[in-house]
Each structure stands twice: as structure tokens, then as C-alpha cells.
């Protein structure tokens, strides 16, 4: 992953923080900025995941642009740890902070928002929250929730896969965490595509919890179980898709069995260019990591009053880009070769409609 757009994050001193009489897990911080400036905090799943590593890079870029202390919290897929680490930062900063969080699971969002409200901090959530939890119920501290509609993109990747298979054959599918909103929506998109394509048979669907290791194990088992019956592999994210590609390489079938993912990470785009994957969807995690902080920071510093913003600024879909063999090279040249240059003041520029709940 030492490639241009995913060189990783700069080294930062790992420090320990105390909360509720116990020591929370380490977080990564950039120190030495003005005491009056709010600390900006990204809470993500893992720095070893290329998607979240790029999210973190965007957060660091925003923090540098405003001269703020930057803290990265890593949950490693542990909800209790994620919530405890955020509460520890709230205690450490006295609430003088902005938090941009991708909750490990939907139920995690509520205690996080409630803790931020109680501490006077400002928070933006992304991807996961309960449907009945809304920013306007926690004014002004719960600034916004950002997501991407998983159904159309899950369906688009299934359709790209089916096209690469010639419209017939068997597929296996790798899903995310069961109670995770994006995982549920992307699976629904897959189901819709399957219903519309009678020539495609779903051989098996297994949850791999967004993890490459689990996806590799499941794909290897499938290759043994189903053999040549597998004509394609659909994965709910790129990490799992790339694990499937790795299994296919070992089996001598990479490039022969198309694979699709979602996230638009560099390795996935490169795999599409090589012909080992058929598609992915780019969310721009650099934008997510930086703009989520920027929205919260602008609210915290008084640039706008969240309570006066329309609901389609409080809960909104961002914009994804479908990448296939037709546009992978041009996307790579425009978005990966060099570090993105974003206007951090354009906080509503990618609003793509208010989130709808079924």
C-alpha cells in the first residue's frame, strides 16, 4: 500500500488517554496547536484498511489547513472501544472538539451523539446510525449525518459483474457486518439485480464483516466447494473483493472470474485496469475524512448555525462514482496519481439529496 494515493498516514506520537478511571486504547495525535482552537477528531475502523487510511489522510489535511490539533481514534471493529475512546477525548478536551465518526455499528451512534451533546462538542456521523436518530433532535451539537445510498451502487456493481460474465452463470457474494447500514443496503441492491437477471444464480452469500482475512478464507472454501460453477464474485467492499482476487490468483483464475467491490481504493482501481476486477464505486474517503471535520468545525466556530440549515444539509447523501474498465484509467490519472486538492469551505458542495428511510 506504499503507492502514491495510499502512502499511509504520517507518523504521529501514540499517546494514552484516561477516561472513567480507566485507560482507553491508544489514539494517534498531532500536538502543539493553539489551545483555543477546537481539537478535530476522526474515529474510524482501522488504519490498515486503505479506505480509512485515506479518510485519515483527508482529516490530517483539513486539520493542517486550520491549524488544529488532529486526533485519530481507531476502533478495530470494537464498538465498546470506539465509544469509550470518544468519551475519553471529550473528557480530555473538555468538549472543545469536533468529532467526525464512522460508527462501527448503527446503535453506536446514539451514545456517541449523546456524549458529544452533554460535553458541548460538535459531531458529524457517517454511514451508520439508527433511522430514528436525527441531527435536529440534538441541536446544535449533532451537526450532520452523511451517507451514500447503498442500494443503487450495490445494484450497479452486481450489474457490472453480470455483464462481465456474459449475463449467465453462478456467483458467490461477500457481505459486510449484518447490522451495518451500508452492508444491508448494498445487499439489497444485489438482490434487486439478481431478481432482474434470471440467468444468474447466487450460489452462496456469506458475511465477512468487511475484513480481507475472513473474505479470503470464505473465498478459498467456495473455490473448493463450487469449483468452476463460480463465474463471478460480488463483494460489499474493496478489501473483501481484493481478498477474493488474491484467492483467485492462487487458484490460477484471476482475470477469468470477474470480481466487483465498493469503495474505490487504489488497489481496486489498479485491479480493474489489470482486468482482475470488473468494477468498484469511489466514495472519495479523502473528502469524507476532511469534509466531515470541516462541516463540524464550521458549526463549532460559528460560521453557520446547524439549527437554521435545511434538513437536506443535516442528513444527506454524498456522491459516488461507478468505476469499470471503461473509465478506470482516466479515474486513476485524475484522482489517484496526485493528492486531491479540495476547498474545505465548500461544505455543502456534494450534497446529493436528503436521506430517505424505508
At which residue positions do the language-model features occur?
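Hinge/cleft segment of the Venus flytrap/periplasmic-binding protein
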Residues: 36, 174, 178, 193, ...
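Hydrophobic alpha-helical segments within soluble ligand-binding/sensing domains
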Residues: 82, 144-171, 215-216, 264-268, ...
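N-terminal secretory signal peptides
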Residues: 1-13, 17-27
Amino acid at each position: 500500500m506504499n503507492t502514491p494515493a495510499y502512502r499511509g498516514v504520517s507518523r504521529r506520537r501514540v499517546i494514552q488517554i484516561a477516561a472513567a478511571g480507566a485507560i482507553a486504547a491508544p489514539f494517534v495525535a498531532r500536538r502543539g496547536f493553539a489551545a483555543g482552537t477546537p481539537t478535530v477528531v476522526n474515529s474510524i475502523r482501522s488504519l490498515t484498511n486503505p479506505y480509512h487510511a485515506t479518510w485519515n489522510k483527508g482529516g490530517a489535511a483539513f486539520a493542517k489547513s486550520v491549524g488544529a490539533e488532529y486526533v485519530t481514534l481507531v476502533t478495530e471493529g470494537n464498538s465498546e472501544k470506539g465509544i469509550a475512546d470518544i468519551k475519553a477525548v471529550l473528557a480530555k478536551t473538555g468538549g472543545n472538539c469536533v468529532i467526525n465518526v464512522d460508527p462501527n455499528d448503527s446503535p453506536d451512534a446514539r451514545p456517541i451523539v449523546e456524549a458529544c451533546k452533554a460535553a458541548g462538542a460538535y459531531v458529524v456521523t457517517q454511514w451508520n446510525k439508527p433511522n430514528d436518530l436525527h441531527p435536529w433532535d440534538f441541536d446544535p451539537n449533532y451537526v450532520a449525518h452523511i451517507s451514500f445510498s447503498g442500494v443503487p451502487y450495490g445494484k450497479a456493481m452486481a450489474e457490472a459483474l453480470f455483464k462481465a460474465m456474459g449475463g449467465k452463470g453462478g456467483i458467490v457474494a461477500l457481505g459486510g457486518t449484518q447490522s451495518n447500514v451500508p452492508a444491508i443496503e448494498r445487499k439489497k441492491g444485489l438482490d434487486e439485480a439478481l431478481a432482474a437477471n434470471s440467468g444468474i444464480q447466487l450460489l452462496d452469500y456469506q458475511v465477512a464483516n468487511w475484513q480481507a482475512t475472513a473474505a479470503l478464507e470464505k473465498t478459498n472454501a467456495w473455490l473448493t466447494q463450487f469449483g468452476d460453477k463460480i463465474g463471478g464474485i460480488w463483494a460489499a467492499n474493496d478489501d473483501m473483493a481484493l481478498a477474493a482476487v488474491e484467492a483467485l490468483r492462487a487458484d490460477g483464475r484471476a482475470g477469468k472470474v470477474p470480481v466487483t467491490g465498493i469503495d474505490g481504493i487504489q488497489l481496486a482501481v489498479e485491479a480493474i485496469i489489470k482486468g482482475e476486477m470488473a468494477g468498484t464505486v469511489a466514495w472519495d474517503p479523502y473528502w469524507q475524512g476532511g469534509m466531515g471535520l470541516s462541516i463540524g468545525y464550521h458549526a463549532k466556530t460559528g460560521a453557520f448555525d446547524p439549527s437554521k440549515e435545511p434538513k437536506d444539509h443535516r442528513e444527506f447523501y454524498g456522491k459516488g462514482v461507478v468505476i469499470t474498465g471503461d473509465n478506470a484509467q482516466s479515474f486513476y490519472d485524475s484522482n489517484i496519481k496526485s493528492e486531491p486538492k479540495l476547498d474545505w469551505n465548500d461544505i455543502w458542495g456534494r450534497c446529493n439529496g436528503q436521506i430517505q428511510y424505508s
